[in-house]
């Protein structure tokens, strides 16, 4: 039986609001959902929340590419995410967004408290700046070589190879991920969270049992090398919350992202009206707070986040449950191989409970990576769920409904066997509690094997053919369905939809604490198929569909490319016919008789050409004189009523004031050919 009711708040890491959910994300959400459903079955008061992480430069830039506002983009992504999670039966009590009034309130509150308590420092720093885009570059928009392990193509905040964290200015050979330009250094004032002040508290907390041993050991390396102040500022332009009293400065996304847990929970409290927010977040709270996260974001959750909470007068997490990555067929998820599978693609082809079961069968409480082997996935689900579990009901239910009026026996013929199944309750509960889901599944399937041995030994299909054996037939089938009920109760956190169909058939709710009493003289419903085998053809179709999605995944062009698509393909010989030359604009003057034309005198380095250009709406003559430009030098002269035009200058833009003549590098000389 379960112990006294506990008050528990569970969160999953917040998915970033600029892309789709894939099967790697889904591991964490399935893991947390199984644990939450188990706790609900045990009678505990548990709240399960999440939100979209909706701030940052990546979202701002992607929205620009799509030609929409960041608010429009994150609203659409949130709807997509929630649809995917619902499809996989993730039972959130609330799903919110970090771009919310609640999150702004708590972000400003925590920042203000940290500042008032002396934990926020201000200093002028030199930061990487994109000279082409005229913007400071956030960590994730600088890429280069890791200063620690020398791995190439790493982001500006942490290395995905060795796990080191660093400043973007420490990268070797940095490049802007926005334009590809080499960044320059530029000074700006930033605010820092003084993490070193929390070193003693964090060292004690991280070794208190609040983290897995592997994580605690890893964090010890960072304590050994010393903690550093954390830059919590980003410069405009930025999509996020402006820092109070600091115009043009914004909270770094990793400051307000974990605060999103509080924002989402406050949103739930306000909607429900019967939940006390402070009972879960105050410093003296005795409620339990658990974060399920991936191993790639341990540093933020196990150092910055508890320090922020402590410094602002809130409670720290009870535990942080860290999992590994998902590989597919023994390798990193691959777009080209079709193993980078979106949740929505999976749902178009397969039952989500198949993946829930497979993940559960392989999950433990360590941070090992989990391999989704697609052949094993098919074999295990078909063998365990269909052949072993559902088969128990399908082999015996028909006899109950057709021969025994749909009613189970009024006594249990095998009480010792039944006791074997119910006595496993606490072992399986302990496995669920400790997130040893694979151990729970092994226990359940071992019992399923025992139940099938019982059915094989008793052979109800043989008994059914014998005259006067209705009592024996009833005893065997009733025992089998009672064993099936116990097994389905144990599996309910993993496969809630299958459990719901079993409940409809058994005509009873599957409650953990009810299994001690078997179903006697109980009516069941006519049996319907409970679960379908996985067809390997559907798995292949899912992989093929993922390949096709990647081939067409490039976002639809917006802006100039969409307005004027690329012209039909030409050959190199076609291009070679064009003679493009650098030209110096010696003189420019308006053509009084024409609204759009300027008369240009172009020096080709020994020859001067007269060209009429329709750029009067964008340039005055004074702006052009002395500039280098590019002209088509071998275009046939064209006689106009103002004179002869002996070529064409090149310009870009839709027209009007938005016309831009091409200006080559200052090193180019008049007369040079462009090739």
Curated annotation (Swiss-Prot):
Binding site for ATP: 335
InterPro entries: aa-tRNA-synth_I_CS, Anticodon_Met, Met-tRNA-synth_bsu_C, Met-tRNA_ligase_1, Met-tRNA_synth, Methionyl/Leucyl_tRNA_Synth, MetRS_core, MetRS_Zn
BP GO annotations: methionyl-tRNA aminoacylation
Highest taxon above the source species: Bacteria
Obligatory cofactor(s): Zn(2+)
Free-text cofactor note: Binds 1 zinc ion per subunit.
Domain tRNA-binding: 574-675
Keywords: Aminoacyl-tRNA synthetase, ATP-binding, Cytoplasm, Ligase, Metal-binding, Nucleotide-binding, Protein biosynthesis, RNA-binding, tRNA-binding, Zinc
Motif ('KMSKS' region) on chain: 332-336
GO terms for cellular component: cytosol
Catalysis performed (reactions): tRNA(Met) + L-methionine + ATP = L-methionyl-tRNA(Met) + AMP + diphosphate
Binding, Zn(2+): 146, 149, 159, 162
Localization terms from the record: Cytoplasm
Motif 'HIGH' region, chain ranges: 15-25
Annotated Pfam families: Anticodon_3, tRNA-synt_1g, tRNA_bind
GO MF: ATP binding; metal ion binding; methionine-tRNA ligase activity; tRNA binding
EC number(s) given by UniProt: 6.1.1.10
NCBIfam families: metG, metG_C_term, PRK00133.1
Family: Belongs to the class-I aminoacyl-tRNA synthetase family. MetG type 1 subfamily.
Role according to the record: Is required not only for elongation of protein synthesis but also for the initiation of all mRNA translation through initiator tRNA(fMet) aminoacylation.
Subunit architecture: Homodimer.
Record's protein name: Methionine--tRNA ligase
Protein's organism: Tolumonas auensis (strain DSM 9187 / NBRC 110442 / TA 4)
Underlying gene: metG
């Amino acid at each position: 039986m379960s112990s006294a009711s506990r008050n528990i708040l569970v969160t999953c890491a917040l998915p970033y609001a600029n892309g789709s959910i894939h099967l790697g994300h889904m591991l964490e959400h399935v893991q947390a959902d199984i644990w939450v459903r188990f706790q609900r079955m045990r009678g505990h008061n548990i709240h399960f929340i999440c939100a979209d992480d909706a701030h940052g430069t990546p979202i701002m830039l992607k929205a620009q590419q799509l030609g929409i506002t960041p608010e429009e983009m994150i609203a659409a992504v949130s709807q997509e995410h929630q649809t995917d999670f619902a499809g996989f039966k993730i039972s959130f009590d609330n799903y919110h967004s970090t771009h919310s009034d609640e999150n702004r309130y708590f972000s400003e509150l925590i920042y203000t408290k940290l500042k008032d308590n002396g934990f926020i420092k201000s200093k002028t720093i030199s930061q990487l700046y994109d000279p082409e885009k005229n913007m400071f570059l956030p960590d994730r928009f600088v890429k280069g070589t890791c200063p620690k392990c020398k791995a190439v193509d790493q982001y500006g905040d942490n290395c995905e190879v060795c796990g080191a964290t660093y400043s973007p200015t420490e990268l070797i050979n940095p490049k802007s991920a926005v334009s590809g330009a080499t960044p320059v250094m530029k000074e700006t004032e930033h605010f820092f969270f003084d993490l070193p002040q929390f070193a003693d508290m964090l060292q004690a907390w991280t070794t208190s049992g609040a983290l897995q041993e592997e994580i605690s050991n890893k964090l010890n390396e960072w304590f050994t090398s010393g903690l550093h102040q954390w830059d919590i500022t980003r410069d405009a332009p930025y999509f996020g919350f402006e820092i109070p009293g600091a115009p043009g400065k914004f909270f770094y996304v990793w400051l307000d992202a974990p605060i999103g847990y509080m924002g989402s929970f406050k949103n739930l409290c306000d909607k429900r009206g019967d939940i006390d927010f402070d009972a879960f977040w105050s410093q003296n709270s005795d409620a339990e707070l658990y974060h399920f996260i991936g191993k790639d974001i341990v540093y933020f959750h196990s150092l910055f986040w508890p320090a922020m909470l402590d410094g602002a007068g809130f409670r720290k997490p009870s535990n942080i449950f860290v999992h590994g990555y998902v590989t597919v067929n023994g390798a990193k998820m691959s777009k080209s191989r079709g193993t980078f599978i979106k949740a929505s693609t999976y749902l178009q082809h397969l039952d989500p409970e198949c993946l829930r079961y497979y993940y559960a069968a392989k999950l433990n409480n360590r941070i090992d990576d989990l391999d989704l082997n697609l052949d094993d996935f098919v074999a295990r689900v078909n063998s365990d769920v269909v052949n072993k579990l559902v088969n128990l009901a399908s082999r015996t239910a028909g006899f109950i409904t057709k021969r025994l009026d749909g009613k189970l026996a009024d006594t249990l013929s095998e009480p010792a066997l039944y006791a074997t199944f119910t006595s496993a309750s606490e072992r399986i509960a302990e496995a669920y509690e400790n997130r040893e889901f694979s151990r729970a599944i092994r226990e359940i399937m071992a019992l399923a094997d025992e139940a099938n041995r019982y059915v094989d030994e008793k052979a109800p299909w043989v008994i059914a053919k014998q005259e006067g054996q209705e009592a024996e037939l009833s005893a065997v089938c009733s025992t089998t369905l009672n064993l099936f009920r116990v097994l389905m109760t144990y599996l309910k956190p993993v496969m809630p939809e299958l459990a719901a169909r079993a409940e409809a058939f058994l005509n009873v709710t599957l409650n953990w604490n009810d299994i001690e009493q078997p179903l006697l003289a109980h009516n069941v419903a006519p049996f319907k198929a409970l679960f379908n085998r996985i067809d390997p053809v559907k798995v292949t179709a899912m992989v093929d569909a993922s390949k096709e999605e990647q081939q067409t995944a490039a976002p639809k062009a917006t802006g100039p490319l969409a307005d004027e698509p690329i012209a039909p393909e030409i050959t190199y010989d076609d291009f070679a016919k064009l003679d493009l030359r650098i030209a110096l604009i010696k003189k420019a003057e308006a053509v009084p008789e024409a609204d759009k034309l300027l008369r240009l005198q172009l020096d080709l380095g020994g020859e001067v050409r007269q060209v009429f250009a329709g750029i009067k709406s964008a340039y005055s003559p004074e702006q052009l004189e002395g500039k280098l430009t590019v002209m088509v030098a071998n275009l046939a002269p064209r006689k106009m009523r103002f004179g002869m035009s002996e070529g064409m200058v090149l310009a870009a833009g839709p027209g009007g004031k938005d016309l831009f003549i091409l200006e080559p590098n200052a090193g180019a000389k008049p007369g040079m050919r462009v090739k």
